[in-house]
Amino acid sequence: MKSVSKNLNSNISQQLFYLLVLVLFLRVDLVFENNTPTGGDMGAHIVAIDTFIKDFMPNLQINGWSNDWFGGYPLYYFYFPLPAIITFIFNLVFPFGIAFKIMVVMSTILVVYSIEKLMRKTSNQISIYGATAGLFYVFTESFTIYGGNLASTLAGQFSFAYSLAFANLSIFYLIKSKNNFR
């Protein structure tokens, strides 16, 4: 019984350590300032998500027509709507700028979590190697064009970070289901 509680305490302390590292490097104090994030393509994504929240969600639409650019274009017909939905949910509690930044930071945290989950040996023990690999991946600055790391996510490629995280989680659950039905 003592070994179970010792492992649980160790697991919780490891998770808290990696969460603390993320919180310290992601500057959560800046996330909760009510301003509009900028950098890279971020400004263009703000317009699209703002249109989604103000025009589409009151009508319970996921996609529709936007008159913002090019004399109008179909918005969210060919683009990933989950970040806009997440921003809408947080916008019910927080102002738009804070809700948008929470959605962006969540994508980075989800990437680290998905890499850690993919490298776990058991489902209840945190993988130190996985969490470390996730942090190294997120903090790498050498491949900003590919997305998924912090530099590209803050430049507006947060949709790619979500897709990368969901791909890792899909692989994890496929492996887990294969092992369960063996």
What is each PLM-predicted segment?
Residues 1-29:
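Start-transfer (signal-anchor) and selected internal transmembrane alpha helices
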Residues 1-2, 14, 33, 116, ...:
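Glutamate identity and glutamate-enriched acidic tracts
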Residues 2-6, 120-121, 176-181:
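Positively charged n-region of N-terminal signal peptides that target proteins for export
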Residues 11-16, 125-130, 181-182:
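Membrane-interfacial loop-to-transmembrane alpha-helix junctions, especially the N-terminal start
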Residues 25-168:
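Active-site lumenal/periplasmic loops and adjacent helix-entry segments of GT-C-fold
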Residues 162-182:
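Membrane-interface transmembrane helices that cradle and orient dolichyl/undecaprenyl
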